[in-house]
Amino acid sequence: MKTHIKLLSATIVALLIGSAHAAVTQEEADQLKTTLTPLGAERAGNKDGSIPEWKGCPDLKAPLDKLKAGDRRWDPYANEKPLYSVTAANMAQYEDKLSEGVKALLAKYPQTMRLDVYPTHRNHCAPDYVYENTYKNATRAKYVTNGKEDGVEGAVAGIPFPIPKNGIEVRWNLNMRWRGVAFESKDRHYSFTSSGQPVLGSQAHQFEQYDAYQEGLTPEEHAKQGYPNFKFMQFVDQPTFRAGEGLMVLDSTNCTVQDRQAWQYLVGQRRVRRAPTVGWDTPDFVVSGSNFFDEVFGSVLSCNERYEYKLLGKKEMLIPYNNNKLFSLTEKEMFGQNHHNPDVLRWELHRVWVVEATLKDGKRHAVQKRKFYVDEDTWSTAMFDGWDHSGKIWRVSISPAYYFPDVPGMLIHNDFLYVLDGAWSTRGVMYEPGFQMRQIPMKSKTEFGPDTLSARNIR
């Protein structure tokens, strides 16, 4: 009897922890070297040529010496003109290319909101080791779950599911996408009053690191390390009443082994404390609580606990892309009264994966449903929309993509979030006196530990 119970228990555990989604066949994986790009997008352009063929890293004569030093980044397409503009008056003509959120913004601000659409450039690329690992991941990566948390095993330094079969796999591609290895930046995060006045939530020195993208890392070594992935550390210097605060967030690629860890340093308390609420629909204090923590940069939390994900397919959509122009602007030039300045945001036509996330029965969250629009080339969320529990569209996120030739690739560093019955906010504005986002050597596990917050902030 005891033996029977042990065998039954082992079977249940295996079903819960084991792979929920089978890896693709070798024949399918070989498409990454023919009809698909090395990261899983369609290599060919579309029928009318408005989306071009992917041809790898472009040679745009980037001033790499300045970019590596953190100087202001240049716009390779500064001389291009819009092909056309989408407004409230003509959006019906482009309805199938617009997200529900973008249509809602055009309808709410018919006199001022506009999409200027430019020629499409597919600039995303990555180092060869990322391509090689993505090819290997296609047949070795496994989605695992314990019935509550989930994760990925067998995937490192590349896209885990470059030929996705479902929404969960697209979600993990988003979480584990290529975006460099280690960076530092100086950023400002704003919310806006009803009259359009910016309110500084925080000005901070920030560090971000992606341990799963260490060159030469093996799946076995990554597992021994505890599946580390995204690491974030922030030190606030403005506004004055928040100066000295610190925040650290550590995410993994396998939440069945290690869930999100977060710590906060508060000057008034002069100590580091755990911050378990840094996630989900907790108001984000970095931007004065104007957005939720799981809305940052079009993100989803690594760990899947509250939502069911459904892959709705792939379609052509207008998304913010190649927005290097924003790097050279002042904040006054970027902001309008009720939304970003449409004169400075560049939109292009790209193919995106559409993923719908619906709140699980019995789970709590202020947002009942979301749709994510994930760029096929970068696996970044270009936009997402959120609906409240009455079925009304409520929240709209827009995340411009920038070309970073020194990484290389298209990365997201700031976003605009609109609450349709409230205020709007923006994160990751690289302000004038500081320096542009720049690559740095990886920090050690000790440096990305909670003691660093208190040591850095002793006054």
Which residues does each PLM region occupy?
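Gram-negative bacterial Sec-dependent N-terminal signal peptides
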Residues: 1-21
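Gly/Pro-enriched, hydrophobic low-complexity segments
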Residues: 23-24, 29-57, 86, 99, ...
